[in-house]
Amino acid sequence: PGGDQQDQWQLVWFLRFVHHGLDLQEGMDAPLFHSMHFQGSFFPRECRPGEMMIEPNVGEKVIAALRERGHKVTVAEPWSVGRLTAALRETDGTLRAAATPRLMQAYAVGR
């Protein structure tokens, strides 16, 4: 699940982890969004300029600011945007993992 949104969710998580210092799980637990502006890869290959979907826990101020800037914002159900998992092996051999809490579809398991 995810189609054209997967790469967007992964990029948001990656930037949070690499540039904003969030750990694996914090980056996944933070609010997610995706754009529907570009032509879809799958039939019927729709393009919805200016449209985006965002989770409500980003806050009303952010949602209002996006709308003021002309975005067509759809507010999704809480914890419903994005499906992510991540794993990291530290230089000391420690394995770290994280899984999205969204829709209870993922687990982080290591050995």
Specify the residue positions occupied by each region the protein language model found.
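Proteins synthesized as precursors that undergo proteolytic processing into mature forms
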Residues: 1-78
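Cofactor-centric catalytic regions
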Residues: 53-111
